[in-house]
Amino acid sequence: MRCVPVFVILLLLIASAPSVDVQLKTKDDVPLASFHANVKRTLQILLNKRCCQVMPQCCEWN
């Protein structure tokens, strides 16, 4: 009989505890589209640098 109040209190505490479903975003949670855009931009920069060394007329002047 003494355990019943303790059991009820524990149940109330567990029910009022915050949920662990919410997770913070980490730096690894980058959207895939953003990753592809970064890769495309980096490859374009490298291509432009290489092209400018071989043929200066194909350089993009922004």
Swiss-Prot record:
Contains 2 disulfide bonds that can be either 'C1-C3, C2-C4' or 'C1-C4, C2-C3', since these disulfide connectivities have been observed for conotoxins with cysteine framework V (for examples, see AC P0DQQ7 and AC P81755). Expressed by the venom duct. The keyword Signal applies. It holds the Pfam family Chi-conotoxin. It is found in: Secreted. Residues 1-19 form the signal peptide. Keywords: Cleavage on pair of basic residues, Disulfide bond, Gamma-carboxyglutamic acid, Secreted, Signal, Toxin. The keyword Phosphoprotein does not apply. GO terms for cellular component: extracellular region. It comes from the Eukaryota. Residues 20-48 form a propeptide. InterPro entries: T-conotoxin (IPR031565). One of its GO terms (molecular function) is toxin activity. The modification 4-carboxyglutamate is found at E60. Belongs to the conotoxin T superfamily. The cysteine framework is V (CC-CC). This is Conotoxin mr5.4a. It comes from Conus marmoreus (Marble cone).
